[in-house]
């Protein structure tokens, strides 16, 4: 069956179930002024929701290609269960506001997308209700949630497959705890008012725009060889503790472009219970408010980088296999241990305003400030409990060591001072 079926300004009296079965080349539209009091089941190639009220359960399946942009303006008073069974896109509440007064279940059985709130439309999820993946699963494709406000504190849980991507988009507000698992993960402008726990299980480099506010504890786990970029373009605010885990070999990179982040006073950034055995953690453009001590303990196979534009106002302790200083200001003491055998070359450009104590416990080397000047405004102590080497400066780049007090070098250590 092909063609168009548009239902508008229709009021159903009574609760008889309605079943609308159209072909993959057909289009079904629920238009403004329609009120359906019974359960509605629909299967169609293309699907639009443009201002209807559903008082019974809605079950809808899109089977055809194409991007279907629903205007919005709908009221859903019962469960909504929408499945994308195509490589096309379902776009909900694009221009006007939707109201979800019951659970919202979204599934994808093909490679298509379900996108919500991508333009000016918004949505409200009623108190005690959830938005989640439906019984058919979300093994691949993309789910993007935008401009959705959750009323109340009901926990939300999103479980997608390792080939699927999940985006928390612009204008969302979640008032309950949020947990998610997905192959790819993007954080692009959402406010989380309770705890947020996320796991990335798939490959690929995921660059989150940023612009998020985290008012509860945040715990992010990388369980793949992929890359997670946080606050790449816009600023994030972490108003509670920030925990990172890496259970594979991937990288978590923060503030690598124009975005910045602020960690609230009294809060910590540290490794979570899942550990950070391998891979990389790069902390860039990150400002800690207040003097709370920070402790970053990574495994011997993991790399830790203190990146450009970061400011730590508390004492910092770190342990990692590889260690890099790429342009951070430390206003407290620094005590770092390198436990891995690699040759680590730091760019430099750091300011150490407190006592700095760096220890190597393995073979390999550490080259400090290779391309930009470091400033040490308190004692520098270098220790070596193995046979590795410290190299201070790079004569080719013309860098220098500036000591306003003095350096203490503990044997046995091979040190080159330029």
What spans do the regions from the language model cover?
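Extracellular beta-strand-rich, repetitive "passenger/adhesive" scaffolds
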Residues: 1-75, 81-351, 355-418
């Amino acid at each position: 069956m092909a063609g168009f079926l548009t239902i508008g300004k229709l009021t159903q009296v009574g609760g008889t179930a309605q079943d609308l079965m159209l072909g993959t080349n057909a289009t079904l539209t629920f238009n403004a002024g329609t009120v359906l009091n019974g359960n509605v089941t629909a299967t169609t190639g293309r699907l639009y929701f443009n201002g209807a009220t559903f008082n019974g359960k809605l079950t809808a399946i899109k089977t055809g290609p194409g991007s279907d942009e629903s205007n919005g303006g709908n009221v859903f008073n019962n469960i909504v269960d929408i499945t994308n069974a195509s490589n096309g896109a379902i776009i909900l509440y694009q221009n006007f506001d939707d109201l979800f007064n019951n659970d919202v279940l979204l599934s994808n059985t093909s490679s298509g997308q379900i996108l919500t709130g991508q333009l000016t439309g918004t949505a409200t999820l009623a108190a005690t209700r959830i938005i989640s993946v439906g019984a058919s699963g979300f093994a691949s494709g993309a789910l993007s949630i935008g401009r959705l406000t959750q009323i109340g504190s009901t926990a939300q849980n999103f479980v997608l497959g390792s080939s699927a991507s999940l985006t928390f988009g612009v204008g969302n507000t979640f008032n309950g705890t949020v947990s998610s698992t997905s192959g790819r993960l993007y954080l692009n402008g959402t406010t989380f008012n309770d705890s947020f726990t996320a796991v990335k299980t798939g490959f690929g480099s995921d660059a989150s725009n940023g612009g998020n506010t985290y008012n509860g504890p945040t715990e992010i786990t990388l369980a793949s060889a992929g890359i997670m970029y946080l606050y790449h373009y816009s600023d994030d605010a972490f108003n509670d503790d920030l925990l990172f885990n890496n259970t594979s070999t991937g990288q978590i990179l923060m503030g690598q472009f124009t975005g910045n982040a602020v960690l609230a006073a009294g809060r910590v950034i540290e490794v979570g219970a899942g550990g950070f055995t391998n891979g990389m953690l790069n902390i860039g453009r990150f400002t800690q408010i207040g003097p709370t001590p920070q402790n970053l303990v990574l495994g011997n196979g993991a790399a830790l980088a203190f990146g450009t534009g970061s400011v730590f106002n508390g004492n910092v302790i770190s342990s990692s296999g590889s260690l890099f200083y790429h342009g951070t200001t430390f206003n407290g003491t620094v005590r770092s241990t390198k436990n891995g055998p690699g040759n680590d070359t730091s760019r430099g450009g750091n300011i150490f305003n407190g006592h700095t104590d760096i220890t190597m416990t393995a073979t390999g080397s550490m080259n400090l400030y290779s391309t930009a000047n470091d400033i040490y405004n308190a004692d520098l102590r270098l220790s070596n409990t193995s046979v590795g080497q410290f190299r201070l400066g790079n004569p080719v780049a013309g860098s220098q060591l500036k000591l306003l007090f003095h350096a203490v070098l503990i044997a046995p250590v091979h040190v080159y001072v330029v």
